[in-house]
């Protein structure tokens, strides 16, 4: 039986900072153009985190565009309101996407980026909830990673084994989905969406020296996640601390090659008959 923990896997005191630093505005804008974000639209940023991406999308929606960011972290909604909520046409609201979005919308476009990977069991339920507040003829845009955090070379075999065991444990204990990206097409297909299209991009592509913000992001991820599965490191030389130091050494080596694919999937909600 799956043991489900409904808390956010990456919750920590620096999560808003991590999410801010890892967001590449140029990459977000390129993805949004592919998704069809245009001025004047009414958009929902589903799972907005600290609001940086919502703010980038707001810029692209002007003039006369509006965007609502929702998230199930009250702390990050307050952060978003403080840092990005002082402009007309942008708003933030606390809401758990696993529940219906009553009295919201309807929206021209719904943006769902890096959300479903943290909600493995409820992913399709979330999609159905979003579909209910999307206008007929509106666009649903799903963006998520696949084979998340698992593609590295030359990672020693004993470290690679720990990483795969860790991801399996996070799946069963914390509802995390390292393979969320490959499932996006099936969601829109099953809902009968029109004009479904997909695109594949490298989200992480690391070789040689790595930018400081990427080092912070990956080291923080390994630090937070490894604390949730200490038993996996009992037989590792030096325990969890030993693994953490070995991974940092590997990741900081300019010989390391690491990549993670990002899958983008968009479709149009069928118009009313």
Regions found by a protein language model. Name each.
Residues 62, 119-120, 134-136:
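Helix-to-beta-strand junctions that scaffold the AdoMet/dcAdoMet cofactor pocket
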Residues 124-139:
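A short glycine-rich, Lys/Arg-flanked "PGG" loop and its adjoining helix->strand segment in the class I
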Residues 5, 14-15, 199-256:
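C-terminal helical/coil "lid" or tail adjacent to the Rossmann-like core of SAM-dependent
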Residues 102-110:
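A short acidic, Gly/Pro-enriched loop at the edge of an enzyme's catalytic core
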Residues 44, 50-100, 125:
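Class I SAM-dependent methyltransferase SAM/SAH-binding core
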Residues 141-210:
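Conserved catalytic/acceptor-binding region of the Class I
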Residues 22-39, 56:
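Conserved alpha-helix/loop element of class I SAM-dependent methyltransferases that forms part
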Residues 2-26:
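Class I SAM-dependent methyltransferase Rossmann-like catalytic core
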């Amino acid at each position: 039986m799956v043991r489900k923990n409904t808390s956010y896997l990456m919750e920590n005191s620096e999560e808003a900072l991590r999410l801010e630093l890892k967001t590449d505005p140029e990459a977000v804008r390129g993805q949004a153009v592919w998704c069809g974000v245009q001025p004047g639209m009414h958009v929902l940023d589903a799972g907005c985190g600290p609001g940086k991406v919502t703010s980038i999308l707001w810029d692209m929606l002007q003039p006369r565009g509006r965007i609502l960011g929702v998230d199930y972290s009250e702390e990050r909604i307050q952060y978003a309101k403080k840092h990005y909520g002082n402009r007309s046409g942008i708003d933030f609201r606390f809401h758990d996407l696993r529940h219906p979005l009553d009295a919201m919308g309807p929206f021209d476009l719904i943006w769902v980026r890096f959300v479903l990977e943290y909600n493995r069991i409820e992913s399709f339920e979330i999609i159905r909830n979003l579909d209910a507040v999307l206008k007929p003829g509106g666009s649903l845009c799903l963006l998520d990673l696949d084979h998340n955090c698992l593609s590295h070379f030359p990672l020693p075999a004993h470290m690679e084994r720990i990483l795969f065991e860790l991801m399996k444990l996070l799946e069963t204990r914390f509802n995390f989905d390292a393979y969320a990206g490959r499932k996006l097409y099936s969601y829109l297909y099953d809902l009968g969406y029109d004009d479904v299209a997909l695109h594949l991009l490298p989200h992480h592509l690391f070789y040689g020296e790595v930018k400081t913000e990427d080092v912070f992001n990956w080291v923080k991820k390994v630090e937070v996640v490894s604390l949730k599965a200490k038993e996996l490191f009992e037989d590792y030389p030096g325990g969890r601390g030993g693994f953490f130091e070995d991974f940092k050494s590997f990741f900081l080596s300019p010989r390391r090659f690491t990549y993670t694919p990002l899958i983008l999937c968009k479709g149009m909600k069928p118009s009313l008959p």
